[in-house]
């Protein structure tokens, strides 16, 4: 089994592994299912102040991360993580989805470039064939939180991370799974009645055929109500 090797470029190295040091991802890290190393972009900064950004040509608000600084940091990352694919979390990128995650994992060597300020110089993206990826239509302060989000998704897809790998087939967005790319059905556990609200009787019937049909019907209804665009692919 090949290990997922991740290199993260950031001006805030203390943010990692963050949440990835806990639960499934943390256990997988301990079990060497994935590994990571951090490169502090400021180590390649200019002047005694280790500057990594500058004013934008053409005006505009905000500062841009310099290509010379990022280029040196990326070269260092590539020397540690050969043949790696570089991803840059950005609101301009393709939207990250479960399908996108599976495509990413076809390469077990990944580099994440965490931008800050107004963004990075476009020449860096062109020079290193960087793929921009978005975690949604909103703006964050930097690329670290999107990187943590993306990695959490990727790691749980790796063999050996989940005790029961079949769990993946009954989750939302899994096109080859129980809900065929739709949203997961409602979930219930003990007690049978809580504050006057009862578990649907069909789930207590023991009739697996009826239960499976109910789960699929619930999934379709919830998907149609909340994410109707997902039904176009079903």
Curated annotation (Swiss-Prot):
Name where it's found: Cytoplasm
Please name the Pfam families in this protein's record.
Answer: tRNA_m1G_MT (PF01746)
The Swiss-Prot or TrEMBL record describes its family as follows: Belongs to the RNA methyltransferase TrmD family.
Using the record, list the residue span of the signal peptide; answer none if the entry has no such feature. none
Top enzyme class, one word, equals transferase
Q: What is this protein called?
A: tRNA (guanine-N(1)-)-methyltransferase
The source's superkingdom equals: Bacteria
Give the source species. Answer: Rickettsia prowazekii (strain Madrid E)
Q: Which CDD domains match?
A: TrmD-like
State the Gene Ontology BP annotations. Answer: tRNA N1-guanine methylation
The organism's taxonomic lineage, starting at the top: Bacteria, Pseudomonadati, Pseudomonadota, Alphaproteobacteria, Rickettsiales
């Amino acid at each position: 089994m090949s290990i997922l090797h991740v290199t993260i470029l950031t001006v805030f190295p203390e943010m990692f592994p963050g949440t990835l040091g806990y639960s499934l991802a943390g256990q997988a890290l301990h079990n060497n299912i994935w590994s990571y190393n951090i490169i502090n972009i400021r180590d390649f900064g200019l002047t005694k102040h280790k500057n990594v950004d500058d004013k934008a040509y053409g005006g505009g608000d905000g500062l841009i991360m310099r290509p010379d600084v990022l280029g040196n940091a990326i070269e260092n990352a590539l020397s540690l993580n050969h043949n790696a694919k570089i991803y840059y979390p950005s609101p301009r990128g393709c939207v990250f989805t479960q399908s996108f995650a599976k495509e990413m994992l076809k390469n077990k060597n990944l580099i994440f470039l965490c931008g800050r300020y107004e963004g990075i110089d476009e020449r860096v993206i062109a020079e290193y064939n960087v793929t921009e990826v978005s975690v949604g239509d909103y703006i964050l302060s930097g690329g670290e939180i999107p990187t943590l989000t993306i990695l959490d998704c990727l790691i749980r897809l790796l063999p050996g991370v989940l005790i029961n790998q079949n769990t993946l087939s009954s989750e939302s967005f899994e096109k080859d799974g129980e809900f065929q790319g739709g949203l997961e059905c409602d979930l219930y556990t003990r007690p049978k009645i809580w504050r006057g609200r009862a578990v649907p009787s069909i789930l207590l019937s023991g009739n697996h055929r009826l239960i499976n049909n109910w789960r699929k019907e619930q999934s379709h209804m919830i998907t149609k109500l909340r994410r109707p665009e997902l039904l176009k692919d079903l």
